[in-house]
């Protein structure tokens, strides 16, 4: 039986529940029942599994037992956090009617909907990570993509041209929740993601989207945002905005504009590159030993989030990058001092979002007040800094003296968590509130006086006055003296050793006190809403200030990191090439216990490709990755881990580094490797930086060497990209002799007996040998296996040396040794002196057949 079949056969309470559930069929409905939120039917079963709570039954309705699960109302946020992390959504249904006046079930309604992408509550968010809601649209023209961070109001759109670019955007933004149309075709792109929401096609209708967006921004058209013709992106943005309005059920004044993100504005990195460079997530899925882990010592959560956005979106605008470099240089002397007041500013960005949604809690307002109190000190520290970008940011940080004064007068020093707890509004702010509070607070004095008076008047030494949450105020007398109480004492409660009474005077006072407490709380709630009304008109300036403070935090952090980690300011040139003196890997140098060996690198139009050889563990991958990371850091405006660096124009960074089977998609290591290689060969340009590590190792020697040769040749001669090409195929070291713009470098090692010492130093020229067996021994491969391998190596080297010299050129090359025909192998194995005449004749026929 479906839950809503034959509604009339259910109890009135279950009828109410089923009507509400019908409005939210796809998400869990938490239905308030006294001190619990309860879930019924299929919701109860799902919640029991997801939240690990007991599944029970609650009586019967329509003749069937009702599956039920529940959580205490005061623990709801903990359970919502777990649901959100699992990509689930929930509707919170509260009692809004008065039980005393209700006929039948108390009136209830859904007051908020919690989804992974629309949360703004501090308890549900990770403070140092963006939490994005996204929507995707796809048709024959390409993709439309929109993201919104409801906790900041940051609204972005893009139009990725193809599947690879869309995959890179999804990895970069990593949305907590993704809306997609019901006819979406490339499901392989999104099917493994959490928080997927299938939406009807009409929600992506273009005209409706434009209308919704103009209504939100208070504009007649979208030309001012530069998105009027971005039809694919606008479809996604319209669906996203409607979804937010449906779930938040309030106005969204902090969402005030839309920004178009264009590929050409930044350095493009595909999904594989972001993963391989371990910017914010390591290859194991954690955050340890990533670039962000080393670079992010920001003192505010909003600064930390901005830094990670910069890491994932390196830009090409030299003017902006120069501004950032100059700001970092200007802040180095005061970075530590500036971080002290910035730390006290806290997460102003998200507090303002909760203010806009009218969900800010008392402690949010106290934190806002504390942030305002830091602004004069920030101004004092920054005013002497003669750097245009610093002064521009400072001009965006207003000093909100009036708002600070309002919050200092209105909010107590240490407010409670919730307004409903009372005691949020400070004494002296509102005379009427003070009067009602005085009445409620005077209860203690009155009760003390009443107790003394009654005890002396009646001569009952066990008499005392108290309060109980269930029965209210009472006069308690021991059982032994209860027969002495006067007739106007009305029994209210009997205990084992005492009786409790009420008298008209106490009852009258009880009504007065309870009324005063209720009245005081009602006035407080009204005043709290009024404070919102006084703050909200200043929201645009507040958001501008919060954004500027976040950027100042990022720049001060980068200044501190540059000083502490010995980074230098790179030169950004308009001439092609990369020249690095004393370059270091920013993460590896911090993790290593021994000193990191720095290395130079030169790429130019005359030296476009480096063929990198050397032993495993010698540092080839580190050398390649550090180059990409130095380029990336330079294009986010940061100083870099090098003695000196000059970086020319870069449009893309590609990495083909390492690989593993993609079991989820049914792709082998080699297939993953070739897919990434194809992407590079199709999309790289002269201004791209390409890292190719051990290409072709996932197949046979001949196939692998052929592919590696052809790829290197293509990158060097046709594409002319700046390429670092690490390989174990020593045949490739002859490429510089045959092609212009190609050079050999190697990482050296010293072998002593069966031990090996890696020098980690990059030298010009090709490596002399591979040291593979020494590395195997170092890894713990048994000695007898190493010994047998050395024997086999000598045999193979002997065969190779005795064979005809290989001739390798671009059109035809002999790879290692030609394959030996079976007839030749048979002849080599034959001992003619041991054959009889008959056997010799048989061998002639056999060899004839082989040939």
UniProtKB/Swiss-Prot annotation:
Keywords: ATP-binding, DNA damage, DNA repair, DNA-binding, Nucleotide-binding. One of its GO terms (cellular component) is cytosol. The keyword Cell cycle does not apply. GO terms for biological process: mismatch repair. ATP binds at residues 614-621. GO terms for molecular function: ATP binding; ATP-dependent DNA damage sensor activity; damaged DNA binding; mismatched DNA binding. Pfam families: MutS_I (PF01624), MutS_II (PF05188), MutS_III (PF05192), MutS_IV (PF05190), MutS_V (PF00488). Gene3D superfamilies: 1.10.1420.10, 6.10.140.430, DNA repair protein MutS, domain I (3.40.1170.10), MutS, connector domain (3.30.420.110), P-loop containing nucleotide triphosphate hydrolases (3.40.50.300). InterPro entries: DNA_mismatch_repair_MutS, DNA_mismatch_repair_MutS-lik_N, DNA_mismatch_repair_MutS/MSH, DNA_mismatch_repair_MutS_C, DNA_mismatch_repair_MutS_clamp, DNA_mismatch_repair_MutS_core, DNA_mismatch_repair_MutS_N, DNA_mismatch_repair_MutS_sf. Signal peptide: none annotated. Belongs to the DNA mismatch repair MutS family. This protein is involved in the repair of mismatches in DNA. It is possible that it carries out the mismatch recognition step. This protein has a weak ATPase activity. This is DNA mismatch repair protein MutS. It comes from Yersinia pseudotuberculosis serotype O:3 (strain YPIII). The gene is mutS.
